[in-house]
């Protein structure tokens, strides 16, 4: 079997970097792109100076201002970011057409069969980053590895404006020391559970056989078994069609009533719409849906099949319907939308 050469390109603080490039007076100031702090907005991204104060993506804007009082919050210009992303993708296409965009600011490239630069994925990634800087005035980080999972992990290793290469021979030794929270799909709550079991890194996970993993993690066991060993069979799919988009929050303390659930909805909607704007040039919104995971880990979902609104009132209604099915403390809330490549025409009743 031919060893694959996968590159993951991740633009550095993309929205903020575009704004600093276009307005150099912002370069030495802490800035973020996001919503109004007075209207329950959230941060889409922050430059690295702001991150030193603890400002992070998906953080409420009011909290970001508390951490960094001098923070300049700019309203996002998604049309500009989409144009910039398109120009960057044109650079990718100079080397390969096997490109899988994940969002406006990151993508996977399969360069396994590319002959340019002597077929070296390392040199190709370096050349792409240099061209992005030369032609667009922006920096990118890159990860080079034998599969998508490892390439994405690698791109974060030397951020910002860095590159990390993981050869097939280095994978086993690298995985032993990789923290479990670096595994795709493991969030804060899952990581906390793993840590409580003494599983701090992938080497610890590798000591568990598949039967033990199944007892602990159910349907996720096989995925964990492979990923903790650096195994990922997924291909780079250039024509991937997305069927839905969602965001969710897992709470360290359960939400004990419906009103507490309602209070979380504006923040989730803001995060969802920021994510949608990144793909709105490709997809139309179809139907809203919600997901609730109760404290006993039972899950319910509700989809709105009649109206195509994606506002606060709609999601409150769906959350209420879902919550009333059990009327119990809530561990996780998720909001989402199904997607379509074609715009649906909604007929009126009269």
Swiss-Prot record:
Catalytic activity: DNA(n) + a 2'-deoxyribonucleoside 5'-triphosphate = DNA(n+1) + diphosphate
NCBIfam families named in the record: PRK02406.1 (NF002677)
Top-level taxon of origin: Bacteria
Primary subcellular site in the record, as a coarse category: cytoplasm
Cofactor(s) demanded: Mg(2+)
GO process terms (BP): DNA-templated DNA replication; error-prone translesion synthesis; SOS response
Alphabetically ordered keywords of this record: Cytoplasm, DNA damage, DNA repair, DNA replication, DNA-binding, DNA-directed DNA polymerase, Magnesium, Metal-binding, Mutator protein, Nucleotidyltransferase, Transferase
Subunit structure: Monomer.
Protein name: DNA polymerase IV
Role noted for this protein: Poorly processive, error-prone DNA polymerase involved in untargeted mutagenesis. Copies undamaged DNA at stalled replication forks, which arise in vivo from mismatched or misaligned primer ends. These misaligned primers can be extended by PolIV. Exhibits no 3'-5' exonuclease (proofreading) activity. May be involved in translesional synthesis, in conjunction with the beta clamp from PolIII.
Native species: Protochlamydia amoebophila (strain UWE25)
Record flagged with keyword Hydrolase: no
Annotated InterPro entries: DNA/RNA_pol_sf (IPR043502), DNA_pol_Y-fam_lit_finger_sf (IPR036775), DNA_pol_Y-fam_little_finger (IPR017961), DNA_polymerase-Y (IPR050116), DNApol_IV (IPR022880), IMS_HHH_1 (IPR053848), Rev_trsase/Diguanyl_cyclase (IPR043128), UmuC (IPR001126)
